[in-house]
C-alpha cells in the first residue's frame, strides 16, 4: 500500500486546460503495488498493476509537482534498503485523450538493486544517470534514452563500470549504441532489431568491435 503526507493546491477548476497543481510529498511510504494503485487514481489508462516488481520492498518518497496538468514539472527521490533513485521530468498531455502521455527528464540511481525490482538474479546494484524521453500510446511505449552513463553495474556476478549508451525503443524496433570501457572489457556495439508484426520475422543489423576482454576476470 502507501501512506504519507501530501500537501498542495489546485486552481483553475473546472477548466482542465487551465488547472494548475502545486503539491509536495513528504515521508511517503509505498510499495510497488501501492504505486500502481496511486498512479491508477490519476491516469486515464485504467488500473496499473505493478505488484510483480520489488516484492517485499518499501520505498521512502519525497517529491513535488508544479504546473499545468498537461505540462507539469515533477521531482521525486526514492530511498530504500535496495538503493536509491532520483528523477526530474516534465509530464505532458496527461488529460488529453487524443494524445499519448509524455515524459521528458532525467533519472539517477545509486546502488539500486535492479534485480530485486524486476525479479532476476542476473543484475543487481547499479549506479547510473540518463536522460529519457517517452511517449505512452496504447500498446507499447516509445522510449528514447539519451546519454546513459553507467558508473557501476553488478551483472552476472561481475561489477562493470565505464558504460555509455544511447538508443530508441518502440513496438516495432530497437536501435542503440553501447560503449564499454571497463578495465576488463572494452567494446563498441551498435545495432538494430526490428520485428515485423505481420510475418513475425526478425531483422538484425549490428556492428561490434571488441578491443579487449578478460573473460577470466569477469567469471
Which residues fall in each region the model found?
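Interface amphipathic segments
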Residues: 1-219
